[in-house]
Amino acid sequence: MPSVYGDRLTTFEDSEKESEYGYVRKVSGPVVVADGMGGAAMYELVRVGHDNLIGEIIRLEGDSATIQVYEETAGLMVNDPVLRTHKPLSVELGPGILGNIFDGIQRPLKTIAKRSGDVYIPRGVSVPALDKDTLWEFQPKKIGEGDLLTGGDLYATVFENSLMQHHVALPPDAMGKITYVAPAGQYSLKDTVLELEFQGVKKQFTMLQTWPVRTPRPVASKLAADTPLLTGQRVLDALFPSVLGGTCAIPGAFGCGKTVISQALSKYSNSDTVVYVGCGERGNEMAEVLMDFPQLTMTLPDGREESVMKRTTLVANTSNMPVAAREASIYTGITIAEYFRDMGYNVSMMADSTSRWAEALREISGRLAEMPADSGYPAYLAARLASFYERAGKVKCLGGPERNGSVTIVGAVSPPGGDFSDPVTSATLSIVQVFWGLDKKLAQRKHFPSVNWLISYSKYSTALESFYEKFDSDFIDIRTKAREVLQREDDLNEIVQLVGKDALAETDKITLETAKLLREDYLAQNAFTPYDKFCPFYKSVWMMRNIIHFYNLANQAVERGAGMDGQKISYTLIKHRLGDLFYRLVSQKFEDPAEGEDVLVGKFKKLHDDLTSGFRNLEDETR
């Protein structure tokens, strides 16, 4: 069995020159200072000590370099060797990423567990990120010798799994005339499948490419995002929508359901592929994802059921893993997401949680003796967050054929004590366009998703108006009315506490009842039931339409009844006479989308018509 430790010798390889080494001068937790590093570059990858620990240079002063080590540094000694690799921290991109689980620096955890037989990652482990021996079905596109290719051109397709086609692209920095292209067949990641000639120099390419994680992958141009990210959560899709290529933040205290929302997005959103980064969260949560996702299925347009895991990549960096690797895990995840974006896919990246990432920055900053800013975080916290979120967006991809792709970033934030004035939360909110604020009080009342509809917002509502107009021309007005009802309820609550509900006007009683319908039977959603774990957008629209239709009809009936000589129409009378319709309004959420869109829309339309006729009959009876 091959060793996971690589060449753990007391000295490095004989082929290395002594000038390639530096020597450890100081060790402080994950931070190591090495001398004799003249000529090294910022963010260069190095191997530290006799165990070949992976590290990255984060500061250069003269010939000394400060290195953050991505593994446990216990046992390192002064004068241990530091080997330069002359390349930045990079990820391997190619077939085999989907369905895999990596740590923060893209080491495959399943392979390491199999080879080492241990539940923990051994120090200095050296395992390639992608399996180089697996054979993949390679199908070149209609290209031949003599054709010209430039960076980003798609030249072949690989069958990755029954859910995803993997398009093989030329690296962004390559170009030339084709001198060889492999015929269709099965190849491994070590086999040459393409050869290009440029200015008399020939270069071979495999299906694998590497890319430095801190460098955004180039695009042809950025585009305005105008397609909604449909999550299957009514409160998000209807009231606070995001777009494919948007940036979202989910701040909330512990136990508010951030992880459940992130996982629901991974399971049910209309993205083509999902990169889920567990950054500094509990190991049990990642274990839950690993157990749940392979069992979850999604129904494709042709009726096939496929495992959600086939479109998911997991980057697990749990809270007991080295702190420095948390920072790398975010960049590893976004680089993998950009790779799939460049194929023309819509990618969602979940970062759970960016607060842990910021804490890693704070710890490293403290070790470097940098001047602390608010709450001890480094002064460059906002700049780092911005550079990460800026990698989201809808783009026109580099190369041909012409295609658009997008990366949507959803970042969970865990402010201590649920305090939204925390530096990480406030810096995040100044960058992102969608704010899904979770409320501890709602969570304690078992109202999930616990998104507070009074403080949350989305800046994409205007960009999505054309989509809503095509989908349903009434929806924007209905949504505005629903928001007004919820806001009005908040205003009335203070009056109710002072004088009681009976003292209110009839229209205000109707407002409170409608708001209760919206809160308990529309915004609340049970993620663990077959009928409510995912709500298609047409169901969200029709449910809201019927609730607001009831609100409008009830108000009209009360106003008309006030001017008549007969029996006055009151809220109590409406509730008594139309109790069965009211029950059907409450029961809308129990309609199962598995019955099909036509069946459900038929039921919702019938309820809409029955509401109209029910109120008409009530008015006729009371005249």
UniProtKB/Swiss-Prot annotation:
Keyword Nucleotide-binding belongs to the record: yes
Disulfides per UniProt: none
Protein origin, superkingdom: Eukaryota
Any single Gene Ontology cellular-component annotation: plant-type vacuole
Binding-site positions, ATP: G252, A253, F254, G255, C256, G257, K258, T259
Gene3D superfamilies membership: 2.40.30.20, 2.40.50.100, Bovine Mitochondrial F1-atpase, Atp Synthase Beta Chain, Chain D, domain 3 (1.10.1140.10), P-loop containing nucleotide triphosphate hydrolases (3.40.50.300)
Annotated protein name in UniProt: V-type proton ATPase catalytic subunit A
Record organism: Daucus carota
